[in-house]
Amino acid sequence: MDSRLARLTTLQTSAGEELRRTSIIGTIGPKTNNPETLVALRKAGLNIVRMNFSHGSYEYHKSVIDNARKSEELYPGRPLAIALDTKGPEIRTGTTTNEVDYPIPPNHEMIFTTDDKYAKACDDKIMYLDYKNITKVISAGRIIYVDDGVLSFEVLQVVDDKTLKVKSLNAGKICSHKGVNLPGTDVDLPALSEKDKADLRFGVENGVHMIFASFIRTAQDVLTIREVLGEDGKDIKIVVKIENQQGVNNFDEILKVTDAVMVARGDLGIEIPAPEVLAVQKKLIAKSNLAGKPVICATQMLESMTYNPRPTRAEVSDVGNAVLDGADCVMLSGETAKGNYPINAVTTMAETALIAEQAIAYLPNYDDIRNCTPKPTSTTETVAASAVAAVFEQKAKAIIVLSTSGTTARLVSKYRPNCPIILVTRNARTARFSHLYRGVFPFVYEKESVSDWTEDVEARLNFGIEQAIEFGILKKGDTYVSIQGFKAGVGHSNTLQVSTA
């Protein structure tokens, strides 16, 4: 039974003994920022710690990093990755007089201004916006959302270079420092604010493994971030967050220069009509899969578990369908940052992802990816694809990859084998950021290399087999496929072997 439909007719409805291959990202907040809770989250399935730099001081974020590392001392397990999520360039309202929240009735006409004299003197008649060019990029008839769409305004008139006349489309309250969205409008905000640049430098100094870059609109935005990261941050992975129509429109060019992608559905669902988010999610994930770039699905995945011990059935389906779409990782935000049930949320996400993975028709999926990948491929990718083909033909239980940079493991993951990928590397950073790749189980080999290359390969391979057996991935006598290089260094993975444990 190779067809997708035939596979679904035999689908097991329980998790069974399979190992989850989708990685879980959890945002760390005050309720989870301690080593003991981080250990519990890791045991439940957490792979990547996310720090949200829209909130918190450097002192606080440093404590998250320290506690994440302390959790590894308490519970070694698999290595934990740390991600820095930038605040990004945003448009916000000014400060209301005495910080009052002003009620706004429907059809209420008022002024939006960029005049600095109103920055701290806003009310229900005049509201300051901190985007100086708004009058240049917007026109009458356009919609402006305030506070994640809680309030909607129609632009009636561009009065002058600092002033818009607007009309409310619904009732609500207008407040200080709320986010502003301009759906359907191309904005010219810089890729990085001064705060973002300082935050990136903090990330480099403190050894984060990846950057979640907010509000990416163009490929140049990614190059700007890479420039700020500099030589010391050259091995930090950049994950672009696609959150607006510009990012969607320019996605093909962005994909060429980024390391990974996040479909950030929160702001995206405000910037474009919410029903279109479904199609955009599937499209961006498919393009990322074909490019061999890892992709994260994020925002409101188990939102109700912030305050409830059980998710809604729709949320469970959302997580499962993201896995079926091809997401390498799924992410929790408030559920683990401020929620009452963070460990429950990770456990629920892990169990849901595991069952969803069993619904994937792996062989047809492999054929799709292989047929749609432009030829010729690199030697490393050819070997990676062949290793996955060997898994199907040999019914192998694992692929063991000996790698320095992690590129081979990423390319094996691209072809979505129906078994775990054991990555053995001496590079601890490679092990950590490889959590971005679906199915990759990283292990750090700490022994020094020996001069005899064959002996060194055999030692690392045996280590990989030992780890796979310890984690229940392999049993004695199981078939596995291995990939290694013919000599030391990066980019030489060209040897494939089928063996038994």
From Swiss-Prot:
Reaction(s) the record says it catalyses: pyruvate + ATP = phosphoenolpyruvate + ADP + H(+)
Keyword Magnesium: yes
Pfam families: PK, PK_C
Binding site for Mg(2+): 243, 267
Site description Transition state stabilizer, residues in chain: 241
Residues noted as binding ATP in the record, renumbered to the chain: 52-55, 92, 178
Pathway: Carbohydrate degradation; glycolysis; pyruvate from D-glyceraldehyde 3-phosphate: step 5/5
Molecular function terms, GO-annotated: ATP binding; kinase activity; magnesium ion binding; potassium ion binding; pyruvate kinase activity
Keyword vocabulary terms for this entry: ATP-binding, Glycolysis, Kinase, Magnesium, Metal-binding, Nucleotide-binding, Potassium, Pyruvate, Transferase
Positions with a binding annotation for K(+): 52, 54, 85-86
PROSITE patterns: PYRUVATE_KINASE
InterPro entries, A to Z: Pyr_Knase, Pyrv/PenolPyrv_kinase-like_dom, Pyrv_kinase-like_dom_sf, Pyrv_Knase-like_insert_dom_sf, Pyrv_Knase_AS, Pyrv_Knase_brl, Pyrv_Knase_C, Pyrv_Knase_C_sf
SUPFAM superfamilies: Phosphoenolpyruvate/pyruvate domain (SSF51621), PK beta-barrel domain-like (SSF50800), PK C-terminal domain-like (SSF52935)
Cofactor: Mg(2+); K(+)
Gene Ontology CC annotation, any one: extracellular region
Residues annotated as binding substrate: 50, 266-267, 299
Top-tier EC class: transferase
E.C. no: 2.7.1.40
Family: Belongs to the pyruvate kinase family.
Assembly notes: Homotetramer.
Name assigned to this protein: Pyruvate kinase 1
Organism: Candida glabrata (strain ATCC 2001 / BCRC 20586 / JCM 3761 / NBRC 0622 / NRRL Y-65 / CBS 138) (Yeast)
Lineage, uppermost ranks: Eukaryota, Fungi, Dikarya, Ascomycota, Saccharomycotina
